[in-house]
Amino acid sequence: MLLFFFFIIGLTCTDENFAQKATIAFQTASLNNLIIVLPDTSPRGAGCPDDTAAWDFGEGAGFYINATNPSYSKHYNMYDYITIELWDILLQTLFPQQLTGKRSIFGHSMGGFGALHLFLKSQLFTSCSAFAPIADPVNCPWGQKAFSKYFGPQDQVPTEWTN
């Protein structure tokens, strides 16, 4: 049986950061039937308002949520990307025989928030670890900035992303 390890990266990063800094992980993974999955933080090149204007919003800061603001909702659906699109590609195309594989998720910073939420909300993962997570994004500047753009004013943030 293969084991799936999803590494959810933090603010300002891309799907390449872990791969560049943790090459030993891939050697260990290949010896232990472990599949390392490195989803990106956000869509790239979507052309949404301000998505490349700041380091703490947009590209590099998708927060692994599904945006509801019409300016972002077409592209910023990172929760669905990981739990539906990416998972379907993994199971249907790359590893169709591994439907029962164990899945772990780990995240850092913004990715820690993503890991916790993906674990608690989706029920796809059997274990979760979060290192220095942005655990309460509506009460920190990075989360407030992102959520106000992805969802609108704070009273419009869906409770599924704040609880």
Name each region found by the language model:
Residues 1-163:
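Non-catalytic cap/lid and distal C-terminal segments of serine-dependent acyl enzymes
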